[in-house]
Design a protein with these regions (language model features):
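Conserved hydrolase catalytic core segment
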Residues: 90-133
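Conserved alpha/beta-hydrolase catalytic His-Asp/Glu region
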Residues: 148-206
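Active-site loop/oxyanion-hole signature of alpha/beta-hydrolase fold enzymes
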Residues: 41, 53, 57-95, 99, ...
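Catalytic histidine-centered segment of alpha/beta-hydrolase-like enzymes
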Residues: 254-266
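The conserved beta1-alpha1 loop
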Residues: 29-31, 97, 227
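Post-His helix in hydrolase/transferase enzymes
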Residues: 263-275
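Conserved serine/cysteine hydrolase catalytic core
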Residues: 183-244
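Conserved HGGG/HGGXW glycine-rich cap/lid loop of the alpha/beta-hydrolase fold
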Residues: 15-65
Length: 282
């Protein structure tokens, strides 16, 4: 199904996706560098309990880029609110991965009461009061700028990613969706990443400066902060201050998963979401 479109207050045209399912609405928000369709396998597993909707954040997938390439994460929060309004959601649940989890919190802070509950898997929210200046040499930003963007075909791209870290841990259906919908066709027959490396680097740099942590007390809905027991990015201790600052939150550690948990084991994460957020008896 082709995406619908909605325009943010600052003029970014977003791609919105109906990922299917039956039940109360759930808005799914992807991580930096990915796009809504990689959450398709998660949505499939959630589909017996939730009607899953999603968006491509600015600079990702089929969405446009912001004016002057300003990737301040407040804009991501605005993207979420634009999607909420375009879908006509009232009291939906939100499920976010990494950057997507932070975006849900930013959106709820900006407009309290937007969501009835949130499930945030390793959200990029830091308990530091310091806001470091963007550092172009930071590892994630540097790697994004160096990332190969063009392949001869989607088949070559898939084989490349499946053969080495970090994307070799992704569920095959997730990786297939990442490649199928994350590349655009070029006139010479080759394909190029839609989320350009320079833009992704700017997103990582801006991710060090958002202020979600300082405003967590505005979030009153129930929140589950989930993390992977095998994550090399974050651990239980990193999220303790976030859980403590939220009014109604708890931490859940999922065994055998890393930072890519929702993309590694969509069904396991879906089971966790259903246990935590679905009010209907199992």
């Amino acid at each position: 199904m082709p995406p619908s479109r909605a325009t943010t207050p600052d003029g970014v045209v977003l791609a919105l996706h109906d990922l299917g399912g039956d039940g109360p609405p759930a808005l799914l928000v992807h991580a930096t560098g990915f796009h809504a369709r990689v959450l398709g396998p998660l949505a499939h597993s959630l589909g017996t309990r939730f009607h899953c909707l999603a968006l491509d954040l600015r600079g990702h997938g089929e969405s446009g880029v912001p004016p002057n390439l300003n990737f301040d994460w407040a804009g991501f929060g605005s993207d979420v609110l634009t999607a909420v309004d375009a879908f006509g959601l009232v009291g939906a649940v939100g499920v976010g991965h990494s950057c997507g989890g932070a975006c849900l919190l930013l959106a709820e802070e900006a407009r309290p009461g937007t969501f009835s509950a949130l499930y945030c898997f390793e959200p990029i929210v830091f308990a530091s009061g310091a806001l470091p200046a963007p550092d172009p040499s930071a590892p994630l930003a540097r790697k994004a700028r160096q990332r190969r963007e063009v392949f001869s075909s989607r088949q070559e791209a898939y084989a490349n990613y499946a053969s080495k870290p970090p994307l070799d841990v992704l569920h095959p259906d997730v990786l297939a969706a990442y490649v199928e919908f994350g590349f655009e066709d070029l006139p010479d027959g080759s394909v190029r990443l839609r989320c350009r490396g320079q833009n992704e680097a700017l997103m990582y740099e801006a991710g060090l400066r958002h202020t979600a942590f300082s405003r967590l007390d505005a979030v009153k809905c129930p929140v589950v902060i989930a993390c992977g027991a095998e994550s090399r990015s974050f651990g239980r201790a990193d999220f303790g201050p976030v859980v403590k600052r939220l009014a109604n939150a708890r931490l859940e550690v999922l065994p055998r998963l890393g930072h890519f948990g929702p993309l590694e084991a969509p069904s396991a994460v879906a089971d966790s979401v259903i246990r935590d957020l679905d009010p209907r008896p199992t």
